[in-house]
């Protein structure tokens, strides 16, 4: 079975190559159908391998197996978390391709295979990163998915905003990749190894961590946290989501950002969790401090957005912070909770972006103010947006609710309050949009670009062009079926008995500590906190709609909004600041050693 692991990468790459070569001669329906078939086949393969992933599968590509414990071959590891992420990537890619069939206009120059080919390469890069067993090839897959993501973000190259957003994305993430590569070089200089497990063993044999190990940890983590859009590396994400096509946003927020979090978990657990790596107390401090800052920043910025796609992007940032806090507990419960949380969040967030895309193609805007009351006819879409918002809030029985429940119980203390408030605020922002856009509730907002100093830093969603090339008179069934199925999947992740426990055990079985039997189930406290965050979200949204001036105080968030300047130089400066902060937070590991 392990010999099938390379196919998770080879199949989508081959499909992309064939579409790129023959796309000019294929009808769009055939090209899109072929891409969907490749993604569906890859998803089936990932699920098949996942069912046989205990014990973990290993494959040395090309037969380059270790000799005397050393190898220069490419190691692929098929354990529960890696194959689970690969399956999630394939399923979400299939959803994005199916959605794009009617949401995007005709391909440029008559090349029907161009967009689906890029999406398949993106899928291959993400799957390769998920199953990479050595650090250098993880970097290679990291770069492949990054480069393709830049191209997909700037797909509408005729628009200056798309190019600018893609450029900011590319520059910041490329610098993060350089940091990752330098960290790999330092670790290789110390250990002479590239396989993740071998690096960890070599560091443990060397003794307590020193400045070189600290530098390697900080640089590797910087690259991964840039991809995860953690504070203060997050500035590229809202700019990219504002201009990227909706199917691309579904993948960026649904799974690519989560792969950055997955990389943080994988690298720390396999490489740095031993006596030669970073002590547990220092790792906990790094992850929880950054996680808390990310959650608060994302929630505050999410609340003050009127551009719906930017609002959803900041929501992703906020929930990334919650993921990092749970990882920072360094417990099997925290890891299992995050894994289930990621699955539920992927379905909910991709569905919400799909609904935002429907608004853009139907009304030519994603501005909450401009769309006030205009989407009353879209009752089905309204129901899905409300359901997605409640999923973000953690309403049982969504998978997000069960995962969040386990994670917040593992974190405990003040972090429980942060989980409730962050999920409530991000959900309330989406509910506010639903009430105004689909029901026309509340006073009519003032014209976009109004007065006030804060408006200079406010990004509206007006003036957008429909991605379908023209405003849709009727929303195609595929564009509504995709978010409906995604929400159903997110609901099933929490409602299907035993699914959460299976996810948690798959994660714990892949850790260096070995299998820890954890049971993920609903508890009275978890259900109560989920209901509390949902009720709080509804209350906040109701006040925001009925009394806009009471909670809408943009001046309080003005310092944060000014930081989102759109200037690449500012974003690079913050990347350097973030790297320094990581070093300061981890420094006690060296001083105590």
What name fits each language-model region?
Residues 1-7, 17-117, 193, 197-201, ...:
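Transmembrane helix-loop-helix hairpins at membrane boundaries of multipass inner-membrane proteins
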Residues 13-18, 39-50, 90-95, 295-296, ...:
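Hydrophobic core of alpha-helical transmembrane segments in multi-pass integral membrane proteins
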Residues 5-12, 31-45, 82-89, 115-122, ...:
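Hydrophobic alpha-helical transmembrane segments of polytopic
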Residues 584-593:
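Juxtamembrane boundary at the C-terminal end of a transmembrane helix
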Residues 75-90, 209-224, 418-423, 517-540, ...:
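Hydrophobic alpha-helical transmembrane segments
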Residues 95-105, 113, 119-138, 148-454, ...:
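Hydrophobic transmembrane alpha-helices and their helix-loop junctions in integral membrane proteins
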Residues 244-245, 376-381, 433-531, 546-581:
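Cytoplasmic/organellar membrane-interface segments at the starts of transmembrane helices
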Residues 143:
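Short phosphate-coordinating micro-motif centered on Lys-Gly-acidic
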């Amino acid at each position: 079975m392990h010999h099938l692991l390379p196919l998770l990468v080879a199949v989508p790459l081959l499909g992309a190559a064939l579409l790129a070569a023959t796309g000019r001669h294929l009808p769009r329906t055939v090209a899109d159908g072929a891409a969907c078939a490749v993604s569906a086949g890859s998803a089936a393969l990932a699920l098949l391998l996942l069912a046989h992933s205990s014990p973990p599968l290993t494959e040395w590509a090309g037969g380059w197996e270790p000799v005397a414990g050393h190898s220069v071959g490419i190691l692929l590891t098929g354990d529960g978390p890696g194959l689970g992420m690969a399956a999630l990537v394939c399923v979400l890619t299939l959803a994005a391709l199916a959605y794009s069939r009617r949401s995007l206009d005709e391909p440029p120059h008559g090349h029907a295979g161009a967009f689906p080919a890029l999406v398949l390469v993106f899928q291959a890069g993400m799957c390769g990163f998920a199953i990479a067993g050595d650090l250098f090839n993880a970097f290679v897959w990291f770069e492949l998915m990054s480069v393709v993501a830049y191209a997909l973000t700037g797909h509408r190259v005729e628009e200056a905003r798309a190019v600018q957003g893609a450029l900011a994305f590319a520059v910041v993430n490329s610098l993060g990749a350089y940091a990752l590569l330098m960290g790999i070089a330092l670790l290789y200089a110390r250990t002479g190894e590239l396989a993740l497990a071998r690096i960890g063993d070599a560091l443990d044999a060397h003794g307590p961590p020193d400045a070189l190990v600290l530098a390697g940890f900080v640089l590797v983590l910087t690259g991964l946290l840039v991809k995860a859009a953690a504070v203060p590396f997050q500035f590229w994400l809202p700019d990219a989501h504002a201009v990227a096509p909706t199917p691309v946003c579904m993948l960026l927020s649904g799974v690519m950002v989560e792969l950055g979090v997955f990389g943080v978990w994988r690298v720390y657990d396999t490489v740095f969790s031993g006596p030669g790596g970073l002590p547990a107390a220092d790792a906990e401090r790094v992850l929880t401090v950054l996680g808390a800052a990310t959650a608060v920043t994302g929630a505050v910025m999410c609340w003050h957005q009127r551009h719906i796609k930017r609002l959803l992007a900041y929501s992703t940032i906020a929930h990334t912070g919650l993921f990092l806090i749970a990882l920072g507990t360094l417990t099997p419960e925290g890891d299992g909770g995050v894994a289930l949380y990621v699955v539920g969040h992927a379905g909910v967030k991709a569905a919400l972006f799909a609904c935002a895309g429907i608004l853009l193609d139907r009304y030519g805007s994603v501005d909450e103010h401009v769309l006030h009351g205009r989407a009353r006819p879209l009752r089905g879409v309204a129901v899905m947006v409300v359901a997605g918002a409640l999923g973000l809030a953690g309403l049982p029985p969504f998978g997000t609710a069960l995962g969040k429940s386990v994670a917040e119980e593992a974190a405990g203390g003040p972090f429980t309050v942060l989980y409730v408030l962050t999920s409530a605020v991000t959900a309330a922002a989406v509910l506010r949009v639903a009430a105004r856009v689909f029901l026309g509730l509340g006073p009519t907002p003032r014209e976009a670009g109004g007065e006030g100093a804060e408006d200079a830093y406010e990004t509206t969603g007006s003036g957008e062009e429909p991605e379908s090339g023209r405003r849709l008179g009727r929303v195609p069934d595929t564009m509504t079926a995709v978010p409906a199925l995604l929400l159903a999947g997110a609901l099933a992740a929490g409602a299907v008995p035993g699914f959460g426990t299976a996810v948690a055990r798959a994660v714990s079985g892949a850790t260096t500590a070995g299998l820890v039997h954890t049971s993920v189930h609903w508890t009275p406290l978890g259900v109560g906190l989920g209901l509390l965050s949902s009720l709080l979200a509804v209350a906040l949204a109701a006040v925001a709609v009925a009394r806009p001036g009471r909670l809408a105080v943009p001046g309080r968030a003005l310092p944060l909004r000014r930081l989102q300047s759109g200037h690449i130089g500012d974003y690079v400066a913050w990347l350097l600041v973030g790297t320094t902060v990581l070093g300061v937070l981890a420094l006690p590991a060296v001083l105590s050693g």
